[in-house]
Amino acid sequence: MSDIAITISLLALVAVIGLWIGHWKIRGVGLGIGGVLFGGIIVAHFTNQYGLKLDAHTMHFIQEFGLILFVYTIGIQVGPGFFASLRQSGLKLNGFAALIVLLGSLAVIVIHKLADVPLDIILGIYSGAVTNTPSLGAGQQILSELGLTQTTSTMGMAYAMAYPFGICGILLSMWLIRLFFRIKIDDEAKNFLKESGQDKETLGSINVRVTNPNLDGLRLVDIPGFDEKRDVVCTRLKRDEHISVPQANTIIQKGDLLHLVGEIPLLRKIKLVLGEEVDVPLSSFTGDLRSDRIVVTNEKVLGKKIRALGIHQKYGVVISRLNRAGVELVPTANTALQFGDVLHVVGRSEVLNQAVSILGNAQQKLQQVQMLPVFIGIGLGVLLGSIPFHIPGFPVPLKLGLAGGPLVVALILARIGSIGKLYWFMPPSANLALREIGIVLFLAVVGLKSGGNFVDTLVNGSGLEWMVYGIFITFVPLMIVGIVARLYAKMNYLSLCGLLAGSMTDPPALAFANAIKEESGASALSYATVYPLVMFLRIISPQLLAILLWTLL
């Protein structure tokens, strides 16, 4: 067999062994995809003993391409929620998550200077301690830029030493915080439900009878809250036992019953303007009115504003809600449509079919992947990652690299949604498949490269010392931020657990946090809020650390 054939065969063997190891669980917690790294170390130990030669060029290409696939699909997945997570509702969570990253970076600097740990080793320990594989790839990229290519294998070995406690340390910090503050889980779950009901602007609906005489004879569009900004949507109007879909120019009369959809706080306010809330059923449809869900799949309407489509003006169809990437929104006339948007519409049966023909609603398209945008995005990401940014005082220009470039481009493209007929929506199943393939390829190569001397380093070298450093980098930032967030910010414990798991981008830790109170979504919500920003910071931080520490050598 050729060296290339042997290399690919061994990579497949590593993937099989590693994924099998990753399925092992102790009390519901396992290595997950990280098992591939240890599968590579095991295989590398024996290939080193038997003197098998692997093709270096093939290994290098597979490692880099796997990393690109992984970070690009991560960006496409989290892109729609990335910028939303930076808004006011997520500022506190993202602030604490960024503080964890900052404290971990400071711990790296302290250990590097006081213990005189080599740059490649401390970056590998850092990546393993925070259980973030793209961080490892970014670190190896910047070391190559600094001319330290020969040290990238030892970086992978250090990563493997620190990785196991990186997972266990998150779980331990959750348990200790719970013990220290004597937290009662049921009380925390009740408090979260109470707080989310008051603070989170969820969508709701109410039925209101118009009793304000000042509104009699006004057009619907002239009433505050129903203008073009449309903070609240009126989907049905009942007058004299007849239910209709109101238009913008519909004249409102005293005694009309209106079915309103919007954010709960806004519904409370507009109820005070209109009249009184009534318990009269308007949700059930009579006559030829019906409600439907339409998925936007027609490339011709992507990027267009709802006003430009004229659905409401031409057909009398009201779009009451818009679900985008799992987030429910109140659509306005200026809302631009994206591929995969789910619209809740109300109208007469015959005109709803015309709305479907305009918007698409082709369910099969949701399962198809446009490959052209995928490779456009990857190509743009690689180009962006190769652009040098010259920063005064730095000895070498800073680059986003193959880890940062595709991630940034994917975040932007996912936020844009579409350009012309090109759309960057990717079905969740396809995204997950590409992401898993990418990370398996990357970790398999890292394991093969670093596994030859792993056992010797652990038994006879500095392996145990590296583990101690990793424990410090994992544990100290989590405990400091956890205590501060609970003690001073009064953060809900379930949300705090999601924050700690998200700050390490660690799915096993999220599974553990969810299991604390399975029926509560607090942990998953805070995890999803901080995940996009943390992933970006975890990729950028090792590059900044490498350049900073390299200049201080």
Swiss-Prot record:
InterPro entries: AAE_transporter (IPR050144), RCK_C (IPR006037), RCK_C_sf (IPR036721), Transpt_YidE_put (IPR023018), YidE_YbjL (IPR006512)
Keyword Chaperone among UniProt keywords: no
Record flagged with keyword Cell membrane: yes
Keywords: Cell membrane, Membrane, Repeat, Transmembrane, Transmembrane helix, Transport
GO (cellular component) term, any one: plasma membrane
Location(s), subcellular: Cell membrane
Domain of life: Bacteria
Membrane topology designation: Multi-pass membrane protein
GO biological process, one term: potassium ion transport
Membrane-traversing stretches: 4-24, 28-48, 65-85, 91-111, 157-177, 371-391, 403-425, 439-459, 464-484, 496-516, 533-553
Primary location recorded for the protein, binned into one broad class: membrane
Ranges of residues in domain RCK C-terminal: 190-276, 277-361
One Pfam entry name: TrkA_C
Any one GO molecular-function label of the UniProt entry: monoatomic cation transmembrane transporter activity
Family classification: Belongs to the AAE transporter (TC 2.A.81) family. YidE subfamily.
NCBIfam families registered for this protein in UniProt: PRK03818.1, YidE_YbjL_dupl
Protein name: Putative transport protein PM1071
Species assigned in the record: Pasteurella multocida (strain Pm70)
